[in-house]
């Protein structure tokens, strides 16, 4: 059993897991999910910060029982001959365990290990939870002698799990910030969200087809600077992209060439208006994944008339795109699309596109 600590948008992270592992995912409190599988690569997930293998399940456990389990197990591990110096971090989620109590557990592991002839380095806690950056930079879960102990409680159940890795925020930042072409005006879709969208769509497609896809074919019809296509390429997908703006087509081509380290990689990127374009390969697609037109950017809440104008324009463009592509893709093609919404802080509401309520009339379920 694998425990996943969900990210800043836990509902999206949960949906991603449910798409990839249908019937095997159980929500565990507000911050985590349990996946009934033997192994998992955290780097293939966008919506989970950490992954850990469940070691102990306790019920109605007090801090003394939790502490004893951890101290006894990891003090003995420190004297294993096949391991060099043991590095341990401890995180407690929803566990009503204070930072001072975590520090006491760490100190006890270190003291007992020393008595047994072993050495342990304990990563200091400023809070009950070690942040993802700390886990990643200390390589916790990536080596047998570098572990993060995760304690998490939900209702009467306490899980003690041992990390198998944290999200590689260094690689994600590099793909986001050092690619040659970026454009804040057309949107800055984070690689983590792009990866989540890819997994949601491909997971759904695999469920529909009832088979694992070794090289899924995906299209981003609003490709922008190519973030979704980058993440799809890294997962072995055959990528196609179009954009109304020739500048964005060029940006995507340059970014993919940078990612692949090859100008010779065969790109299927071209200019095209998503509301009327014909994709000759559409029937071969496994998924359509995109961040659609987001409308005019605002620095502050627009007046109601302006907002309705922008909302209507976006609704029209996206509806026409959905109608256009529906006539070209096969019935087993999955779609995952991001569309705009506008938060009005003055009246504490979110304005959404009308098409959401009428998606079935566009031919989708």
Residue locations for each model-derived region?
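Nucleotide donor/acceptor-binding cores
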Residues: 84-88, 215-216
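A gly/proline- and charged-residue-enriched helix-loop-helix capping module
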Residues: 99, 105, 109-130
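Class I S-adenosyl-L-methionine-dependent methyltransferase catalytic core
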Residues: 1-72, 76, 94-108, 134-148, ...
């Amino acid at each position: 059993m694998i425990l996943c600590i969900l990210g800043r948008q836990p509902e999206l992270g949960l949906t991603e897991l449910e798409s990839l592992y249908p019937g095997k995912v159980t929500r565990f409190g507000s911050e985590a999910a349990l996946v009934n599988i033997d192994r998992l690569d955290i780097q293939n997930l966008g919506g989970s910060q950490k992954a850990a293998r469940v070691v102990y399940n306790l019920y109605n456990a007090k801090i003394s029982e939790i502490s004893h389990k951890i101290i006894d197990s990891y003090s003995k591990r420190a004297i294993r001959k096949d391991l060099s110096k043991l590095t341990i971090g401890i995180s407690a989620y929803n566990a009503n365990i204070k930072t001072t109590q975590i520090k006491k557990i760490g100190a006890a592991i270190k003291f007992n290990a020393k008595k047994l002839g072993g050495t342990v380095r304990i990563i200091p806690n400023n809070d009950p939870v070690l942040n993802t950056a700390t886990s990643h930079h200390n390589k916790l879960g990536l080596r047998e002698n570098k572990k993060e102990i995760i304690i998490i409680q939900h209702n009467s159940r306490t899980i003690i799990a041992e990390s198998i890795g944290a999200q590689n925020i260094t690689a994600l930042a590099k793909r986001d910030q050092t690619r040659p072409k970026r454009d804040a005006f057309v949107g800055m879709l984070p690689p983590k969200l792009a990866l989540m969208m890819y997994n949601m769509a491909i997971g759904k497609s695999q469920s529909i087809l009832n088979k694992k896809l070794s090289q899924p074919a995906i299209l981003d019809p609003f490709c922008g600077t190519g973030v979704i296509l980058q993440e799809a390429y890294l997962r072995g997908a055959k990528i196609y992209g179009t954009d109304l703006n020739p500048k964005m087509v060029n940006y995507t081509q340059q970014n993919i060439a940078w990612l692949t380290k090859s100008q010779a990689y065969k790109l299927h990127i071209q200019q095209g208006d998503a509301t009327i374009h014909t994709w000759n390969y559409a029937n071969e697609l496994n998924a359509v994944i995109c961040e659609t037109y987001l409308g005019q950017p605002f620095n502050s809440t627009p007046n109601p008339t302006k907002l309705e104008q922008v909302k209507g324009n976006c609704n029209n463009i996206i509806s026409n795109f959905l109608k256009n592509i529906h006539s070209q893709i096969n019935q087993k093609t999955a779609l995952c699309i991001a569309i705009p919404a506008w938060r009005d802080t003055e009246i504490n509401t979110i304005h959404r596109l009308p098409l959401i309520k009428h998606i079935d009339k566009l031919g989708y379920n």
